[in-house]
């Protein structure tokens, strides 16, 4: 939050909210004495989504830096006024879009590992998928091995929605 220029007072408030929680449990229907909880966010904490957004902002900055230095080439969307999209994020779900190249695979791995080191968050590679459109299966397997993830196929689930045929064809039409 310092690097994002949050005022000292805001940082103190957030630290106070995150670090001073107490709890009590019911034992045989009677509450115990209150005890302090460990530091950090707890499941269901209303601040969690907002603090997570601050944390993953670092990923956006890393992706932007890799793209600005031509180390990562995102996917071009549109014909008349094309836009290059490198990633989409919502809450703790991220989809990374790129053209097929070993340079992109290496940059993707470097970005994700660097993000882990800088943020303290962990990327769940075992639940991550590499999905290709009109890309040779053996290339995908090799690339997924480098990324330490699984190969996915269309349809796949993103944000709880099954992305199938017409949606994927609409979004990725120029690759089909």
Task: Give the residues covered by each predicted segment.
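Nucleotidyl polymerases of mobile genetic elements and RNA viruses
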Residues: 1-176
């Amino acid at each position: 939050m310092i690097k994002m220029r949050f005022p000292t007072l805001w940082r103190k408030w957030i630290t106070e909210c995150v670090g001073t929680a107490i709890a009590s449990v019911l034992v045989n229907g009677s509450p115990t004495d209150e005890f302090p909880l460990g530091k950090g966010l707890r499941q269901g904490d209303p601040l969690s989504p907002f603090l997570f957004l601050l944390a993953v902002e670092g990923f956006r900055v890393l992706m932007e830096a890799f793209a600005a230095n031509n180390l990562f080439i995102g996917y071009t969307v549109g014909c008349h006024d094309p836009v290059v999209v490198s990633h989409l994020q919502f809450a703790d779900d991220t989809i990374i879009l790129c053209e097929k190249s070993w340079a992109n695979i290496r940059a993707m791995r470097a970005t994700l590992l660097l993000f882990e080191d800088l943020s303290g968050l962990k990327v769940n590679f075992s639940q991550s998928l590499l999905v290709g459109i009109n890309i040779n299966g053996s290339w995908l397997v090799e690339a997924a091995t480098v990324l330490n993830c699984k190969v996915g196929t269309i349809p796949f689930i993103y944000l709880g929605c099954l992305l199938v045929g017409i949606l994927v064809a609409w979004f990725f039409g120029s690759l089909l």
